[in-house]
């Protein structure tokens, strides 16, 4: 059933799309918000960006079944989510992170980096880096949607995913 309003922000007719994957995952991936396919199917990263992400995970030896994948905002937004929606979504995301307890969190895109770590960080200057904040370590990469569409970003994304593969193997 698709709710008429989001319980958090009250602004959407789209469905709640929870995170999915291995609840004991050592690796967690966090994106921005569900797109049309995710809204339709009720699962994160199942549309074109998700298919691209799956291909890149497989290419570096990471099985999607072994990770937890979620979004900052749990419902589709038309355009980037605003600060108010992100602010109302963060408590649920923080609860999700505490529940999964990943060893490494991959932040997919600027919205995830700014919402989860700090507004002073950005994908353009911090991609491919590990950021330690609080109890967790974060690895910053471009969003797969941008990597799919822009050749320059795709090249950076693929390089960062090779680094992620090394980090992932170190997790065991």
Predicted regions and their residues:
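Short, flexible, glycine/charge-rich loop motifs used to bind or transfer phosphoryl groups or to couple energy/partner
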Residues: 16-20, 57-58, 95-96, 128-129
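Short, small-residue-rich loop/turn micro-motifs
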Residues: 33-34, 71-73
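Glycine-rich anion/phosphate-binding loops
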Residues: 44-52, 86-87
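A short, N-terminal amphipathic alpha-helix
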Residues: 54-62
């Amino acid at each position: 059933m698709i709710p008429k309003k989001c319980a958090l922000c009250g602004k959407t007719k789209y469905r709640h799309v929870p995170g999915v994957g291995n609840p004991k995952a050592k690796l967690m991936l966090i994106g921005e918000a569900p797109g049309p396919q995710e809204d339709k199917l009720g699962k994160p990263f199942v549309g074109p960006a998700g298919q691209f992400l799956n291909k890149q995970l497989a290419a570096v030896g990471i099985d999607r079944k072994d990770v937890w994948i979620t979004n900052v905002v749990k419902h589709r937004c038309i355009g980037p989510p605003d600060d108010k929606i992100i602010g109302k979504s963060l408590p649920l995301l923080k609860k999700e992170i505490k529940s999964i307890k990943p060893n490494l969190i991959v932040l997919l895109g600027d919205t995830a980096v700014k919402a989860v770590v700090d507004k002073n960080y950005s994908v353009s200057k911090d991609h491919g880096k590990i950021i330690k904040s609080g109890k967790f370590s974060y690895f910053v990469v471009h969003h797969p949607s941008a990597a799919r569409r822009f050749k320059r970003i795709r090249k950076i994304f693929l390089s960062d995913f090779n680094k992620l593969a090394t980090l992932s193997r170190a997790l065991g």
